[in-house]
C-alpha cells in the first residue's frame, strides 16, 4: 500500500495509543504509584500521550479556520454568533461528548451601522475609524467640530475651559493595556463632563498599519452621552504634528450606531463525565463572541477551539478521567460579560456546584506560542499543579506563574473557585486585537497545537488526579 507517512500516522494513531494505555493500566509501575503524589504514573503517562496527540492533530486548527471563514465576526445579538454556536453544538455531538447543550443568556444588542470620519482642516483626508462598542450615533446627521487634543485625563482637566463645543481627541501612547484602555472605556464620560460634543481616541494598540481598533466603552448616568470612536495611531500622530505647527484641526463624524433591546444568545456547554467523581468539575473554555470587525480568530475563536480540542483529545484517548471535564464557551464577553455572570449564578444557585468546581481554566490571550499558565489559588494547589507543569518542558510551556485567571472565569473565581489563564508569547496580540486584522491567517498551526497540548495536560491531569485540587 503506497501511502505517505503523514497519512499513515493520521489513520493509525489511535491503535498504538489504546494498546499502550492498556499496558500502562496493568503495569507494575501504575500499581505501585506513589500514594502521596498528586498524579499517578498512569495519569502522567496518559498526559504524555495527550501532549503527543495534540502536537500532531489537524482537526482543531481546521475547525478554527472553518469558524473564522464561514461565520466571521460574532458580535452579541448577531445572527453570525448564533449560527456559529449551532455549528459548534453539531460538531460537539459528533465528537462523542456525554452531554452537549446550549444555555440561554440575554445579551446586549448594539449595532454599528454605517460610519465615517474626515479631517477637514488643515487638509482634507479620510480618517479610518471604528465607533466604540456601546457608543451612540450622531443622530442621523454629520457632526463637525474643532479638535482639542489631550494626552491624559489630567491634561483634559487642565484644558477644560477650551473644551465646550469641541471634539476631544485622547492621544495617549500605548504602555500597557490596563493603563491605556481607560481612555477607551471612560473617555466619553470625561470629555462630556466639560462640554465636548464628541470624543476620539488613538486606538489602543501596540502597533498599527492604519488599523483602527474597537472595544467597549461606557456612559455614566447624569452625564450627557456623546459619540465616541477610535482613529488610527498614525492619524492621531498626524493631527498632533499639525497642532504643533499651530494649525486648527477640524473633523467631521457620522455614526449610525444604535442600542437595541437585549437579544437571546447562548453559552455552549459540553461534558465528559467523570468515572469516579462525576459531580466534581474541571471547567475550561473561552468566549465565543467577538467584536464586529475581522474574524475573531485570535480573540477568542482560537481560545474556544483550543479548549474544545483539548477535551476532544481526551475523548479520543479512550481514557475517562476520574472527574468531569466541562467545556464552556461563554457568550458576550466583549460587551457585557453576561454569559460568564449567568453561568456562575446558575452554577451556584441552580446546579449547586460551586464547591465542586475544582478548577476553572480560560484561554483568552491568543493562541500564540504558549509559555504556561498563571494560577490563582492556594499554595498547596500551586504545588500540586507544578507536577503537571513539569510535563510541558519539552514544548517550553512549563511556566506556572502565581496570579492568573480571565474575564469569563472571574465570576467563578469571585465565588472561591481556583482559576488559571493560559499565558502565551503576546508581542503581537495588540497588533490585531479588536481590529479588522484579527483573521485566521495571523495564527500558526504549531503554536495552536502547543496551546491545545498545554490545556489538555492540565485539564486531564487535574480531572484524573489521585487527590482533589486543594482550595
Regions found by a protein language model. Name each.
Residues 38-78, 211-216, 289, 359, ...:
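N-terminal capping segment at the start of a domain
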Residues 47-55, 69-79, 145-153, 173-188, ...:
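Second-shell loop/turn segments in exported
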Residues 124, 140, 228, 277, ...:
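Metal-dependent peptidase/peptidase-like ectodomains
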Residues 312, 316, 430-471:
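His/Asp/Glu-rich mid-to-C-terminal helical/loop segments that flank catalytic regions of hydrolases
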Amino acid at each position: 500500500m503506497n501511502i505517505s507517512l503523514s497519512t499513515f500516522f493520521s489513520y493509525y494513531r489511535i491503535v498504538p495509543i489504546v494498546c499502550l494505555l492498556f499496558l500502562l493500566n496493568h503495569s507494575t509501575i501504575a500499581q505501585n504509584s506513589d500514594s502521596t503524589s498528586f498524579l499517578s504514573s498512569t495519569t502522567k503517562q496518559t498526559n504524555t500521550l495527550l501532549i503527543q496527540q495534540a502536537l500532531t492533530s489537524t482537526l482543531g486548527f481546521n475547525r478554527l479556520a472553518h469558524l473564522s471563514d464561514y461565520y466571521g465576526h460574532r458580535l452579541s445579538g448577531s445572527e453570525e454568533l448564533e449560527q456559529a454556536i449551532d455549528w459548534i453544538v453539531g460538531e460537539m455531538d459528533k465528537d462523542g461528548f456525554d452531554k452537549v447543550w446550549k444555555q440561554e443568556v440575554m445579551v446586549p444588542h448594539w449595532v454599528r451601522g454605517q460610519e465615517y470620519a474626515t479631517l477637514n482642516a488643515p487638509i482634507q483626508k479620510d480618517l479610518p475609524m471604528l465607533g466604540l462598542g456601546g457608543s451612540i450615533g450622531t443622530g442621523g446627521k454629520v457632526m463637525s467640530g474643532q479638535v482639542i487634543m489631550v494626552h491624559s485625563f489630567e491634561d483634559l482637566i487642565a484644558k477644560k475651559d477650551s473644551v465646550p463645543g469641541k471634539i476631544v481627541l485622547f492621544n495617549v501612547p500605548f504602555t500597557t493595556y490596563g493603563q491605556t484602555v481607560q481612555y477607551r472605556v471612560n473617555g466619553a464620560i470625561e470629555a462630556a463632563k466639560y462640554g465636548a460634543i464628541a470624543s476620539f481616541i488613538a486606538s489602543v494598540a501596540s502597533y498599527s498599519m492604519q488599523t483602527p481598533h474597537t472595544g467597549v466603552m461606557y456612559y455614566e448616568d447624569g452625564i450627557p452621552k456623546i459619540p465616541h470612536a477610535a482613529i488610527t495611531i498614525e492619524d492621531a500622530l498626524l493631527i498632533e504634528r499639525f497642532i504643533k505647527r499651530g494649525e486648527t484641526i477640524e473633523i467631521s463624524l457620522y455614526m449610525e450606531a444604535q442600542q437595541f433591546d437585549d437579544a437571546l444568545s447562548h453559552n455552549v456547554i459540553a461534558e465528559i463525565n467523570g468515572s469516579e467523581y462525576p459531580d466534581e468539575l474541571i471547567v475550561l473554555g473561552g468566549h465565543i463572541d467577538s467584536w464586529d470587525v475581522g474574524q475573531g480568530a485570535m480573540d477568542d475563536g482560537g481560545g474556544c477551539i483550543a479548549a474544545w480540542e483539548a477535551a476532544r483529545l481526551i475523548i479520543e484517548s479512550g481514557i475517562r478521567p476520574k472527574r468531569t471535564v466541562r467545556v464552556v464557551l461563554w457568550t458576550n464577553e466583549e460587551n457585557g460579560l453576561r454569559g460568564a455572570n449567568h453561568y456562575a449564578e446558575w452554577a451556584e444557585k441552580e446546579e449547586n456546584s460551586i464547591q465542586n468546581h475544582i478548577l476553572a481554566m480560560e484561554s483568552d490571550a491568543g493562541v500564540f506560542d504558549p509559555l504556561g499558565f498563571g494560577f490563582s489559588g492556594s499554595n498547596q494547589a500551586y504545588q500540586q499543579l507544578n507536577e503537571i507543569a513539569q510535563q510541558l518542558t519539552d514544548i517550553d510551556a512549563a511556566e506556572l506563574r502565581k496570579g492568573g485567571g480571565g474575564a469569563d472565569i472571574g465570576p467563578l473565581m469571585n465565588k472561591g473557585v481556583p482559576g488559571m489563564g493560559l499565558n502565551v508569547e503576546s508581542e503581537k496580540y495588540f497588533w490585531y486585537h479588536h481590529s479588522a486584522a484579527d483573521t485566521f491567517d495571523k495564527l500558526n498551526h504549531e503554536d495552536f497545537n502547543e496551546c491545545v497540548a498545554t490545556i489538555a495536560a492540565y485539564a486531564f491531569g487535574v480531572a484524573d488526579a489521585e487527590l482533589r485540587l486543594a482550595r
